[in-house]
Amino acid sequence: MLLVTPVRGEITVVIADDDPRVGSALAGLLGQEPDFRVVAEATTGDDAVAAAREHRAALVLTDVRMPGGGPELVRRLVGLPHRPVVAGLSAQADPATWTRVLAAGGSAHLLEGTLAGDLPVLLRRCVQGHLVVGVPGAADLVRRLLSP
């Protein structure tokens, strides 16, 4: 079962991070990929929602610990009429955080610093409708939750 309707063609992206250096680095990385187009960078949750709405972004990559971020921001974004795919990004692998992000409607939770060249591949999986959890120990936790 796919979580979202897969995106076809160009993937428009809003990057939301309260550290502009991180946002710029992510934009630079995705800008090297022919199928990604960063349409906006935001530093607050409100700005991320406004940018996603204005540009009808297919994907929002957001720091889940920035002011106005987290599960509430994910709910606001997936509640937009065009329902963008939301990928959460965090410097910490805290299971409580990533499970709340996914429960709020996020399609991914990715760990900063472990992505490098994998980020475009993982984000493509998200926009194809797959759930992506790039956090150490996530598979074991999910197995425990699903076991009888």
Question: What do the PLM-derived regions correspond to, one by one?
Answer:
Residues 83-93:
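A short, hydrophobic beta-strand element within the central beta-sheet of small alpha/beta folds
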